[in-house]
C-alpha cells in the first residue's frame, strides 16, 4: 500500500513525500533569524516568510544503504548563513518506519530545528488524534503556547 504521495510532473519539492525540514521547521517570520545579536535574512520561500528549511532543496549523498535502510547526507546549503550539515537515516520495519535526523554545526554555534513534512495519501476513511498543537499568531507563525485542538486543520505543528 502506498502511504506517501509521490511526485507528479508539475510538483515541487514541497508538495509530496516526507521531506526533512532542516535547519528550521515551519515558518520563520519575514525570513529573519537573529542569533548572537546578528540578524540574518533567509530567502522568502513562502512569502512573506521563509519556510521549511534549506535541506529539501539540496542534493543528498547516499552514505550507506540496504534493502530496508538508507542513510543520506547533505550540507545545509548557501542560503543558510551558518554552514553545517545534516544526515537522515530511514529504516523500514515490519509495522513502522524509523526516521532520524542529525544536524551538525559548521565552525561556529548555530540555531537549529528539525521536523518532517509528510504528505499522506488520503484513504477513504481517516482517523487522527492530536491532543495539542502550537498556537499560531495572526501571521500563521507558530508560537510557544500549546493549545487544545479539534484537529480539523491538520496542516499544523502538533505536540
Residue ranges and their predicted role:
Residues 14, 77, 156-159:
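Beta-strand-rich recognition/accessory modules
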Residues 43-94:
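Extended, loop-rich substrate-binding clefts of extracytoplasmic carbohydrate-active enzymes
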Residues 51-55, 81-85, 108-114, 139-142, ...:
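A short, polar/proline- and glycine-enriched secondary-structure boundary/capping micro-motif
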Residues 1-40:
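Beta-strand-rich N-terminal accessory domains
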Residues 29-44, 94-96, 105-107:
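Conserved SET/PR-domain catalytic core that frames the SAM/AdoMet-binding pocket
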Residues 5, 42-44, 112:
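Short capping micro-motif at the N-terminus of alpha-helices
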Residues 1, 74-120:
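Acidic, contiguous internal or C-terminal segments within carbohydrate-active enzymes
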Residues 111, 119-159:
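Active-site/ligand-binding surface loops and adjacent short beta/alpha elements
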Amino acid at each position: 500500500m502506498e502511504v506517501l504521495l509521490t511526485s507528479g510532473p508539475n510538483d515541487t519539492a514541497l508538495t509530496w513525500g516526507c521531506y526533512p525540514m532542516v535547519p528550521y521547521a515551519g515558518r520563520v517570520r519575514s525570513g529573519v533569524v537573529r542569533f548572537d545579536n546578528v540578524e540574518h535574512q533567509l530567502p522568502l520561500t513562502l512569502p512573506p516568510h521563509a519556510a521549511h528549511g534549506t535541506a529539501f532543496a539540496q542534493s543528498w549523498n547516499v552514505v550507506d544503504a540496504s534493502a530496508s535502510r538508507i542513510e543520506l547526507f547533505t550540507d545545509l546549503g548557501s542560503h543558510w548563513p551558518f554552514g553545517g550539515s545534516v544526515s537522515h537515516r530511514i529504516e523500514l520495519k515490519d509495522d513502522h518506519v524509523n526516521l532520524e535526523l542529525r544536524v551538525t554545526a559548521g565552525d561556529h554555534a548555530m540555531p537549529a530545528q528539525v521536523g518532517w513534512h509528510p504528505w499522506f495519501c488520503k484513504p477513504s476513511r481517516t482517523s487522527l488524534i492530536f491532543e495539542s498543537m502550537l498556537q499560531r499568531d495572526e501571521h500563521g507563525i507558530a508560537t510557544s503556547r500549546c493549545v487544545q485542538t479539534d484537529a480539523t486543520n491538520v496542516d499544523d505543528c502538533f505536540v
